[in-house]
Amino acid sequence: MIELKKDEETSVKGPYGEIDMVITPCTVKENTQPVLIMAHGFRGSMEGGGRAKYLADLAGEIAHVVRFNFNGSQLLSRQIEELENVVSYVKQRYAGSKIVLLGRSMGGCASLVAASRDAEIRGLVLWATPNDLQLTFLNSLGKSGYLKLKNGENLYLNDERGELVLTPDFLHDINKYDLIELLSNWKKRPLLVIHGAKDETVPLEQGQQSYFLAGLPKRLVVIPNADHSFTNHGHKAAEEVFSWLQHILI
């Protein structure tokens, strides 16, 4: 049996404050083992309801795994900056290692942008990731909430995830990014698109379109009956990611 190493809690100075992170060290001792960096989704966290930890322990058999929390801003541009900051930290700490990005939902959008800008990123996982942010947030915020932002008003959210104020800048910011174009230009680096068949937030059709737009090598995994958060299918999704990582990294 492989003995799991203790996770390391640390932080790195980011453009908007300290970025808290957890590193699951690879069970193989070599420092040049690959690194998987995981970015969480909209209003999420690096814990991901326990699903992120399960994947980190699995992937730790072949890679160091870095999970981190965005600093509270929901602006995609700021999240991209913070992710790029984490990538820079990883490059310094694990010099010469292959780096793969995994983004969950909106974290996948940040990962797609960051990886498209950085040819040193060796692979990308889009986990329940939208390619049409306007349509996605019209769906998730509801028409009235979306129109408030579009009309220049703040939107106040208060639910089981806590309180959040979205400003009109949120919509203006996501309009800066043409994810369809980035996907169309993604070539020669491995891509995994993993999506739930019953995703209620980002319809499966978006995941399928992302897959078809990208160049080879690529893989599409659709998890039957899985919702946007993979609530009852987190282990299955993690195992699919691990299988893909084994294929591209070993």
Task: List PLM regions with ranges.
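N-terminal cap/lid segment of alpha/beta-hydrolase-fold proteins
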Residues: 1-28
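The alpha/beta-hydrolase serine catalytic core
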Residues: 9, 19, 118-222, 226-250
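Short, surface-exposed "cap/lid" segments of acyl-processing enzymes
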Residues: 18, 28-60, 65-70
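Short beta-to-alpha linker loops that shape the active-site pocket of alpha/beta-hydrolase fold enzymes
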Residues: 42, 69-73, 130, 226
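Aromatic pocket-lining residues of Rossmann-like dinucleotide-binding sites
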Residues: 59, 114-115
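Catalytic nucleophile-loop/oxyanion-hole region of alpha/beta-hydrolase
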Residues: 67-98
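Short beta-strand immediately N-terminal to the catalytic nucleophile in serine-hydrolase-like folds
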Residues: 101-103, 127
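Gly/Ala-rich beta-loop-alpha elbow adjacent to hydrolase catalytic centers
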Residues: 103-107, 111
